[in-house]
From Swiss-Prot:
Protein name: 2,3-bisphosphoglycerate-independent phosphoglycerate mutase
Phylogenetic placement of the source organism: Bacteria, Pseudomonadati, Pseudomonadota, Gammaproteobacteria, Alteromonadales
Binding site for Mn(2+) 2: D13, S63, D443, H444
Organism: Shewanella frigidimarina (strain NCIMB 400)
Subunit structure comment from the entry: Monomer.
Pathway field: Carbohydrate degradation; glycolysis; pyruvate from D-glyceraldehyde 3-phosphate: step 3/5
Amino acid sequence: MAKKRPLALLILDGWGYSEDTQDNAVFHANTPVLDKLNAQYPHSLISGSGIDVGLPDGQMGNSEVGHINIGSGRIVYQELTRISKAIADHEFEQNAALCDAVDKAIAANGAVHIMGLLSAGGVHSHEEHIEAMCRMAVERGATKVYLHAFLDGRDTPPRSAKNSLVHFDELFASLGHGRTASIIGRYFAMDRDNRWDRVSQAYELITEAKGKFTYASAPEALEAAYARDENDEFVAASAIVDAQGEAAVLSDNDSLIFMNFRADRARQITRTFVNPDFDGFKRNKTPKINFVMLTDYAADINAPVAYPSSDLVNTLGETLQNLDKTQLRISETEKYAHVTFFFNGGKEEPFEGEDRILIQSPKVATYDLQPEMSSTELTDKLVAAIESTKYDVIICNYPNGDMVGHSGNFDAAVKACEAVDACIGRVVEALAKVDGECLITADHGNAEKMKDPSNGQAFTAHTSNLVPFVYVGRDAVIKDGGRLSDIAPTMLTLMGQSIPKEMSGRCIIDLKE
């Protein structure tokens, strides 16, 4: 087999750029490798947020959006934008899957349960979408409407859920029907790393009202959680009862509508409700329900979808397949879906010639406890893959900046950045030995802003800052004004290949030779 000259793309998750050095873990980290690369090779800053990635203007980027834009080589208009537009255009209340779920529950004298991340963060969901669903259910005649609120504190300030919970109490009062039936932190309900002990707590809360606590109102439950020193993300399972002390549990003939639009943290809990042979934990109750996913969460989940995804053709992965090129996707479990499913435009199956390596993320409660995560093991596998000269293209995601940045722990985020920098050194060295090249970038910012100057709280969300773009290869100039969708066309050009017409991005590297 002929040896390959690999082109590697290293995605440093959550690694943005900011002139503000205060509470900036990226700035304060000791990163001799990246410092040297920036001094020796062409580099620039590119956009990974807002309208440049198909989000509303000013909206921070996120990992799903970033990887879809990088992998598809075009601006992909995101579900947040698409669903918000449907609501504004009054198309949402006519959505066939949503209407059918509400109507079936009403006809069977059942309840309409609505679950999702109650957040204005706009990363996994938006509370405006949840409000529209509550309104639509009542307007179609549902009198039993129950909200199961997953609390954020990760893409929003750590203690910011109160206004949302109060607003929904007021909303239900104005509608004359419905109430909040439970609250729980996203740490439990939205796990994506097969920690079924967490997900089971959310499942039992919704199906049995089995929580650690019971309260008469959601704001009261939140206040008690704060008194226990639980931020929104970690709020323990709390059932909310009505004036008669009755809980609302998911029962036969009810409908359950999941209002998250992002797939990766929606899959696990969805499977607990819809997979008859689910075995992640023992389910005490398995009610026969009508379940609706807001968007496609996974190809193997058999449930109606309110907003099916549009097909993206000639993504980078598909183009490499058509060119008979070999490719490797590698990351830890936390970002594995991003370098595979999302990078491939929502396609689960690997392309011909595409290999995948999954490294288990550490089993710790939060990643500030192990800021290096599994970066050493990941880099061991990556270096071996480079040395094998088996691959034309390698896509790797280092999750540390994002996953540790979300903890709000500045010192840990600094250590995370330093760990990644050391790994990059090993990768660049391995590539040099096989005459390979490397692009280094990020999908969005996070670790460069670890404190919110407006309130002094830890800043755990993403940012809309520009992200780095470094080319470790031939003598070249990088054009200004780049964005994530320019990366795939640039990679194909570096490989001497033409850019598919479906890719609206442009090559932003001019080779001097």
